[in-house]
Amino acid sequence: MIIDVIIPAYNEQDAVGKVIRALPENMLREIVVVNNNSSDATTTNATAAGATVLQETRQGYGFACLKGIGYLKAKATPPDIVLFIDADFSDQPREAALILEPIINGRADMVIGSRAAGNKEKGSMTIPQVFGTWLATTLLRIIYKASFTDLGPFRAIKFCKLLALNMQDTTFGWTVEMQLKATQQKLVCEEVPVTYRKRVGVSKISGTVKGTLMAGYKILYTIFKYS
């Protein structure tokens, strides 16, 4: 099975290399970092760590993910599975094998790394993040009958299934769009507990009041948009 990784990155010069080097290289064909308008050494450090680096000038988490997907889709041999992980080193890259295993062994089409079901370092998620995740997953359960406990970015999905989702969101609604569409298309989804720690540096989303409010609004908007 061919497995590639997409890592969206915005000003993560201190963390991105750590993420790349900690991933299980023996399981992966290519690690793709999508630099999303960083003003620091994210590109330089990601390249030095051995990743392929793409540039996405349109600001937004979803834009970065879509750029990576387009790159993999255009390859002579696209991947069977794509793994997503953030560039901030808050997730444990070595746990990628846990997320990939259900797909590799044919039990699932998509796997979400659940911080809610795993071990969270104290202070790794803010109170608004915890409440927002609870609210979003509760709405997913009520509206879509979807049994998720988290919207965490650490996840894997069969590439053909990902393309069939026709992902559209360009900012903060990316993860919830993937999960609700996967439910609508009756993909076999599984969650695995993951370890979550304080990120390297300050979050560009939860680290500011504006970022938290914008992310929360977009997630709720996306949930109701497809209902």
Where in the sequence are the language-model features?
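Cell-envelope/extracellular polymer assembly enzymes that use nucleotide-activated donors
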Residues: 2-4, 177
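Conserved donor nucleotide-binding strand/loop of the catalytic core
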Residues: 29, 43-75
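Short beta-strand-to-loop acidic/aromatic patch adjacent to the donor-nucleotide binding site
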Residues: 76-90
